[in-house]
C-alpha cells in the first residue's frame, strides 16, 4: 500500500510523525511525505523517505491559491497512485479530504492535534 503523509511543515513531520513513517515502512508500505519546503525535508530524504515539497502557505487566505493547492494535491495522489492519504493539522486534513475525493479511489485519514 502507498501512503502519503501530508503536514503544514517539514518540521512537524520530522518531530511528530517520523515514528509513524518508520513503522509504516517497516510493515512494507511505501511512504511519501509531503509538506512545504524547509530545512527538515533534506533530513527526511537522508533517512530514505520520499519527500515532496508542497506549494502550501500556512497563512494564506487567498482562495485561488488554496484551490490550486487542492488541485495540485489531487493530481499528486492520482499520479503517485496513492492508496491512503493522512492529513495532519486542520488545513492539511481538510485539503487532503477534498483532494482524495477528487483523485478517486483514495482512502483518507485526518488528524488535528489538540482536540483531546
Whereabouts are the PLM-identified features?
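Active-site proximal beta-strand in glycosyltransferases
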Residues: 2-4, 100-116
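An amphipathic, basic-hydrophobic alpha-helix
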Residues: 56-84, 94-98, 102
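N-terminal strand-loop element at the rim of the active site
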Residues: 5-65
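Short beta-strand scaffold positions
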Residues: 35, 86-87
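Short His-centered aromatic/hydrophobic patch
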Residues: 87-93, 112
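A general structural signal for well-ordered alpha-helical segments in protein cores
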Residues: 17, 41, 70, 93-94, ...
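Structural signature of beta-strand start/N-cap positions in the alpha/beta core
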Residues: 2, 30, 50, 81-84, ...
Amino acid at each position: 500500500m502507498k501512503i502519503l503523509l501530508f503536514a503544514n511543515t517539514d518540521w512537524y513531520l520530522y518531530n511528530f510523525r517520523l515514528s509513524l513513517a518508520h513503522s509504516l515502512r517497516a510493515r512494507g508500505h511505501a511512504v511519501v511525505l509531503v509538506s512545504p519546503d524547509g530545512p527538515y525535508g533534506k533530513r527526511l530524504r537522508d533517512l530514505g523517505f520520499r519527500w515532496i515539497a508542497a506549494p502550501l502557505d500556512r497563512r494564506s487566505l487567498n482562495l485561488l491559491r488554496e484551490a490550486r493547492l487542492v488541485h495540485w494535491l489531487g493530481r499528486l495522489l492520482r499520479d503517485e497512485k496513492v492508496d491512503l492519504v493522512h492529513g495532519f493539522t486542520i488545513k492539511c486534513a481538510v485539503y487532503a479530504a477534498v483532494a482524495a475525493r477528487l483523485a478517486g479511489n483514495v482512502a483518507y485519514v485526518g488528524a488535528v492535534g489538540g482536540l483531546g
